[in-house]
């Protein structure tokens, strides 16, 4: 599990090197909470990167991902999609819960007001960075548990590993 946090000044201007260090080595697996794609959506909307940094990222990301895959990295890009209503429900739950209040930041409250901008940047990201070698897999995440199980099931089906068995549907499910 990898969560890099707020980038340093150097990391902000050396974006791919920052994330390259977080990728797994041969025989390892990494799950990234967020990824280099914060540069494609969150950072430009919230003013955390310049327009030039955003455009450079969008221009170079597909080639960088191809290089990683050519070096043996198996890359699966999940986008956990949430409806605006569900996002608002989760924000209210965080705000009003003694167990979840710590999850809520001022940034979260700003983000919900920029839903349309996030939607636009998300669509641009999908259109420009979903490739044959590295497509986006969008998962409905209104139900967290089902979303997590769906993503794990996807990985188990997609990944080759020793002793893998593909179960056939039972008769009643056909």
Predicted regions: what they are:
Residues 1-58:
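Conserved nucleotide-sensing/catalytic segment adjacent to the nucleotide-binding pocket
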Residues 2-3, 78-81, 138-140:
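Conserved beta-strand segments of the P-loop GTPase G domain that flank and frequently precede/overlap
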Residues 9-12, 38-43, 84-92, 146-149:
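Switch/connector loops and helix/strand junctions flanking conserved nucleotide-binding motifs
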Residues 21-25, 67-73, 129-131:
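Conserved catalytic network of the ASCE P-loop NTPase/AAA+ motor domain
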Residues 30-32, 76-78, 137:
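Hydrophobic/aromatic beta-strand patches that form the interior of the parallel beta-sheet core
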Residues 34-35, 79-84, 142:
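A short beta-strand-to-loop transition that corresponds to the Sensor-1 phosphate-sensing loop
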Residues 43-60, 68-120, 168-171:
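A glycine- and Lys/Arg-enriched "phosphate-lid" helix/loop adjacent to the NTP-binding pocket
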Residues 120-174:
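NTP-dependent small-molecule kinase module
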């Amino acid at each position: 599990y990898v969560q890099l946090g707020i980038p340093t000044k150097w990391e902000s201007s050396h974006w791919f090197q920052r994330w390259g260090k977080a990728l797994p080595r041969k025989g390892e697996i990494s799950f990234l909470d967020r990824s280099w794609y914060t540069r494609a959506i969150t950072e430009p909307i919230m003013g955390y990167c310049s327009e030039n940094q955003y455009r450079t990222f969008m221009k170079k990301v597909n080639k960088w991902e191809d290089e990683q895959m050519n070096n043996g990295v198996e890359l699966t890009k999940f986008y956990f999609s949430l409806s605006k209503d569900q996002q608002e429900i989760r924000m209210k739950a965080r705000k009003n819960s003694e167990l979840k209040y710590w999850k809520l930041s001022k940034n979260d409250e700003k983000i919900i007001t920029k839903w349309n901008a996030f939607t636009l940047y998300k669509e641009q990201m999908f259109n420009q960075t979903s490739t044959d070698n590295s497509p986006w897999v969008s998962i409905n995440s209104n139900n967290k548990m089902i979303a997590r199980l769906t993503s794990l099931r996807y990985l188990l089906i997609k990944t080759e590993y020793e002793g893998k068995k593909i179960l056939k549907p039972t008769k009643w499910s056909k």
